[in-house]
Amino acid sequence: MSSPSISILLPTYNYARFLPEAIESVLAQDWPDFELLISDDRSTDGSAAILASYAARDSRIRCHLQPVNLGMVANWNWCLGQARGEYVKFLFGDDRLESPRALRSLRDALAQHPSASLAASARSILNAESALVGLWDEFQDAGLHSGPTVIQRCLRETRNLIGEPSVTLFRRRDAARGFDPRYRQLVDLEFWFHLLEQGDFVYLPEPLCSFRRHTAQQSEQHAIAEVGKWELFELFAASRARAAQQGQSWPAHQFLPLYHHLTHHCRQTATPPPAMQSLRQELAAEIPPLHYAAFRARRHLRSLAHGIRRRLSAAPGTAPA
């Protein structure tokens, strides 16, 4: 059996309500050379019957019902281990491909840029009723970008500018390590950094995929439980250490927002992890006090200005600014 050019990996757990929408969006693609590998992690909502029906209709669909519940990250890695394509695209059971050109566009982006190890696009936001409620385009800079530069930008801005797995495409050869199970909330961002340490990043501003926001998401549950509270700082420390090993300097003053958040978390937590206290002390020793004081003053002024604008726009008879 010849290998497909793209492996679409769909890990799912209790998403029977959304699965048909996700699968139909794959079958509607204008790039037909793919396999759709679906791994159901012991769902209890009738997902198995839906998957069996689709697998019987299209030979490109392979479904596997896990004998035991693997958990989110282990299920992602199981899918990676089964992929046969040159390129890999994740699509979660509650998301969908928004454009019939999604596979072709992302694949072409990597094929046209051999130095790139990761491609992503803007994404539309769906609610639980499948209505489009927004657009996320945080990266806002189309084209090819240096991997290390993108890593540093995400850390400086303290957010995932790349997006969720459903909006990305990467080469299977670069992903042999898999997702790091030590991470939960930022497991995808850590993996993007792993790929970007191997190559460049291509960004497409068209919303090729859709990401759904609803309270049943595991990522939403993790956020509510603050599972990932310290993960950004752990990721920063690990990335900075690897950069230093390669002779790259990451001056602490370039990451003042991250240092500010770390300081806040340490002060608000009765017993911060020792590694986080050490990281805060290390960064504090490198940042001139006046530099940090100026940052805090600017932050305070921006907050005041934002509050004034909100009050003015809410005042009766006042047009929003």
Give the ranges of each region predicted by the language model:
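A conserved acidic beta->alpha catalytic loop
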Residues: 40-49, 68, 92
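Conserved nucleotide-sugar donor-binding catalytic segment
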Residues: 81, 121-123, 135, 139-233
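Conserved donor NDP-sugar-binding/catalytic core segment of glycosyltransferases
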Residues: 100-135
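N-proximal low-complexity "stem/linker" segments adjacent to membrane-targeting elements
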Residues: 1-27
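C-terminal subregions of glycosyltransferases and related glycan-biosynthesis enzymes
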Residues: 156-160, 185, 190, 197, ...
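Cell-envelope/extracellular polymer assembly enzymes that use nucleotide-activated donors
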Residues: 4-7, 35, 190
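Glycine-rich, basic loop-to-helix element that forms the pyrophosphate-binding segment
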Residues: 66-83, 96
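Short aromatic/hydrophobic "clamp" motif used to bind/position activated sugar donors
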Residues: 88
